[in-house]
Amino acid sequence: MAIVLIIAIVFWLFSIMGNPVSQQQRQPVPTDLPPAAAQSPPLIDVHGPGRTSDLLAEWAAPIAEATGIDPQAVRAYGNAELIAREAWPTCNLHWNTLAGVGWVETRHGPYTGRMFDPARLNESGVAAPAIIGPALDGSEGFARIDDTDDGHYDNDTQFDRAVGPMQFIPES
């Protein structure tokens, strides 16, 4: 019993004393250096015919390789930045912010919440199988959002569900 008490006291002493060596090795966080800006996509006609994100393939390829993000997703993020820039010039939403949301929500598309059934972005940039979140029915941990799309996007006519790689709810 005495040994257990001695060990407990030693651990307690170390916990309140901290580790002075690690305190001395800490470097201050620079406050004068902003993070490097992401490479903006080249200007394209986002109102042009066809799938305009395909025009960003050359821009997206090295970014996809460097980041490990699916090229389809990089092109979609870049296209969304250009659309937002045109629609709301003062918005300043950049593709890498969208990529951050995409990573958190679905790891840029493959995470579906099902361990053995990951999604893939097809040639059209659509996740297959579809990524559909849990019903927003007000149960513990979830907001209650009654259906807004008649089940068109989320196959649920009673409640909304977050859909797609970015996990937007249908009303957004």
Task: Pin down the residues of each PLM region.
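Short active-site-adjacent helix-start/loop capping segments
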Residues: 8, 16-21, 110-111
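Catalytic glycan-binding domains that act on GlcNAc-containing polysaccharides
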Residues: 53-60, 64-172
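Hydrophobic membrane-insertion alpha-helices, especially the h-region
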Residues: 1-15
